[in-house]
């Protein structure tokens, strides 16, 4: 069975991506990163999801990006914008986050002898991050094969982004087909310690709209529904 490293945040998209990789016959090795994000409940969700989907191994890395990057996701003094107030790249953008995450996944893939990395980015229903686009994924894959021993020896690495062209409602439908319980996932940028979502940020809006478009009841725990 081929090995794959799957970046798992604990959110809806990364959980669906893990289920897709598993469904495609990969032995999945999950990688979650604590980069100082304020929505730490997402990492607790990642733990539960990794166990439920029976990953072969689950690594948690601590990498404090708060000293390098000012973002609403890492700096409590920066307000998480309410949906609809963003212009251009939002305050929730964490500089180079996906590049850092993919680089860590790449390093572990080399150690494992894996040629496959999965990431749950989408360029359809997203907040405008530059590192969620198809040309970015293609560029990283090219770099990975130029910069690694595996690539130089002809064992080419593939960065899989199976959700890249899917709207949120199709992602949700695909995940449900694979048996995902989305109530276990946390997407909110400012979820509380129990994982209850604010219902106002971009992530909450996109998630809520996705379930509505899929005509499926939203199982998310919202703070205003307590």
UniProtKB/Swiss-Prot annotation:
Keywords: ATP-binding, Ligase, Metal-binding, Nucleotide-binding, Queuosine biosynthesis, Zinc. Pathway: Purine metabolism; 7-cyano-7-deazaguanine biosynthesis. The keyword Repeat does not apply. InterPro entries: QueC (IPR018317), Rossmann-like_a/b/a_fold (IPR014729). It comes from the Bacteria. Binds 1 zinc ion per subunit. Its EC number is 6.3.4.20. Zn(2+) binds at residues 188, 198, 201, 204. GO terms for molecular function: ATP binding; ligase activity, forming carbon-nitrogen bonds; zinc ion binding. NCBIfam families: 7-cyano-7-deazaguanine synthase QueC. This is 7-cyano-7-deazaguanine synthase. It comes from Nitrosomonas eutropha (strain DSM 101675 / C91 / Nm57). The gene is queC.
